Amino acid sequence: MNRRKTIVFLGDGMADEPIPELGGKTPLQFARTPGMDQIAREGRSGTLLTLPAGYPTSSEVANMSVLGCDLASEYCGRGPLEAAGRGVALGPDDTAFRVNLVTTGEGILRDFSGGHVAPADAAELIAALNERLGDSRVRFYAGVSYRNILVLSGKDFSPGVRTDKPDDNHGEYVQDHLPVASAPEGETTAALLRELILKAPAVLADHPVNLRLRAEGKPEVNGIWPWSGGRVGALRKLSDKYGVNGAVISAVDVIVGLGRCLGMAVIKVPGATGYIDTNYEGKALAAIEALKTHDFVYLHLEAIDEVSHEQSLKLKIQAIEDFDSRIIVPVLQAVGPAVNCAVLPDHPVPIKMGRHTRTPVPVSARVAGVEPDGVTAFNEVDCLGGALGGMKADGLMRVLLA
C-alpha cells in the first residue's frame, strides 16, 4: 500500500461550461492557476463521475463519491452529516434535516442564502424559531450563516419525504416546492415540515435582526427551507478502507460531518467562512501542519460554489485564482514533491444555470513513481485527454491510496 502523504484540494463547484464572454473558455481555462497546472503537468488527469443518476445533485453526494464512499449502502441524506458537523448527537429515532434561512418575496424564493446572513444574526433567528416553534420533539440548531439544522425526534417521524434543494429553485414559488411524503410513513413528517415553513415567516418578520436589516437596506431573512432529511447511518472509516489516518479542513458542516463520520480529524481554521472572504492563508497553513501528523488531508473550499450559485463570473474567476495562489501554490511549495496530491471540483455549477449538474468533473493527480501523461493544464477540456480516463465510484481514492 502507498504510505506517502496525500492531500486533496477540493474546489466546490469549480467546474463550468464554455462562456462566450471568455471567448468560449471555461472559468478554469480562463483563470490563472499555476498550482493546479503544476499538479496536472507532474501527474495524470481524467474525469470523475461524482453525481450518479438516482442520487440528489448535492454536495454531500459528490464529496462522498470523491472520498470513495459506497453510495448504495452508505448514503443517508444530508441532514445527519450536517448534524455530525455541528456535533449534534442523533439517536436512532431522530430525523435530521438541513434547513436554510432564506429570503422570499411575494411567495417566491429570492435568495437561498438569506443574503449570506451573518452567523451571529442567524444564531439569533434560529433561537427565535426554537422559542416559538420548537418543543421536545422539534429542535433547530444554528450552523454557519444560512446553513442550519432541524432535528425531529420520535418514531412517528421519517426521512420518507421528498424535499427540493433550495439552490435549484431560485425564482420559484415556495408553495410549489413544499415537502410531500415519498412513502406512507412520511406523511406525518411532511405535514409538520409544511407547518413549520408556513409559520416561520410570522416568527421572523419583526425580529430585531430583520428590523435592522430592513433599516440597512439589506435582504431580510424571512423564511426557512428544510431539505434532505435522513437518519444516522454507518460509514466505513477511511482507516479501515485505505489504512490511512485522515484530516478534513472545511468551513461547512456537511463536509466536516462527513469527515467525522469517516473517522477523520476535524481541523478548524479561524476566519474560515465558507465564502470569498474566507481565511485562505489559514487553510493553507492548517494543511501544511496537518500533513505532519496525518497521512491524508482533505482541504475543501466552499467559496467557489457560493459565487457560482450567485452567477457572478467575476467572483468565480477571483475565487478560483485565490484558491490557487493562496492555498494550492503555498502548500505545494511547502511540502515539495514527496507528497501525493490531487485537485478537482466536487461537481460543476455552470454560471449560466447557477445550480449543480451531473457532468463528470476534471481531476489531476500527482502520485510518486507514476509517469506524467503529458497534460499540462488543469481544466475541463485538457483533462479529458488524460491517462486516468473516465473514473467512477472510488476511482480517485484508488489512484491516490491503492
State what each model feature region is.
Residues 1-402:
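Feature captures the catalytic ectodomains and active-site-proximal regions of enzymes
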